[in-house]
Amino acid sequence: MTQEKEWEREYKRSKFLTKENKPQADAVRFVSFLRRQKFDAEKPKVLDLGCGTGRNSYYFAEHGAKVSGMEISRTAIDLAKQNAEKAGFNIDYKKLSIGETFPYENSEFDIALDVTSSNSLSESEREIFLIETHRVLKNGGYFFTKALCKDGDENAKNLIKKFPGSEKDTYILPDIGVKERVWSKEDFVSTYEKYFQILHMEKKTSYTRMNERSYKRNFWIVYMKKA
């Protein structure tokens, strides 16, 4: 099941809602990677999966890309549309779950982004998500994923122990109700390499705020390609 109610509730909390258009640093670094790969598509088509308020969509549109975004929260997608309209960007935002069939043609996009959005999908939704992302990417298209990392993350292991979800390596965030999946390197690779060639994978440590406290968390930064 989608977690539309949980995400909508969270986006309505003013402290959770990101109103700025500054992109996430990991998305900017991904663009640097693309340049090193000699990626030279003119006005590339970009699909921002779980786009939230459109921070990363805005960044790609600002640099000449034709962007589409999918987001389950009405509050978030409305703000994303407002920001795009103010800037004069024609970004195609749709209120949809990324765990369902995508409304796009085969091989439509050059780039797909998943910046910690698919973590809350169920296993059945994730299978659809991966099949659909593969379908709508062009051959040779790039897929950037930032996912929660289990390896070496004591906070993730504590959450699994105290607030376990019904599926492997999942937990339910207390006071929020959002489910999250954390990944070992082995599980991530075995799941994603069925669909994509993994070009680069690294573990990154940063801090996440929850219940007015900062927690050290690990993430996987992964660059992939549709071969």
Feature locations, PLM:
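Class I (Rossmann-like) S-adenosyl-L-methionine-dependent methyltransferase catalytic domain
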Residues: M1-P44, G52-T101, E125-I128, Y142-A227
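A short acidic, Gly/Pro-enriched loop at the edge of an enzyme's catalytic core
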Residues: F102-A112
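A short glycine-rich, Lys/Arg-flanked "PGG" loop and its adjoining helix->strand segment in the class I
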Residues: E127-N139
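A short SAM/SAH-binding and catalytic strip from SAM-dependent methyltransferases
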Residues: D110-E125
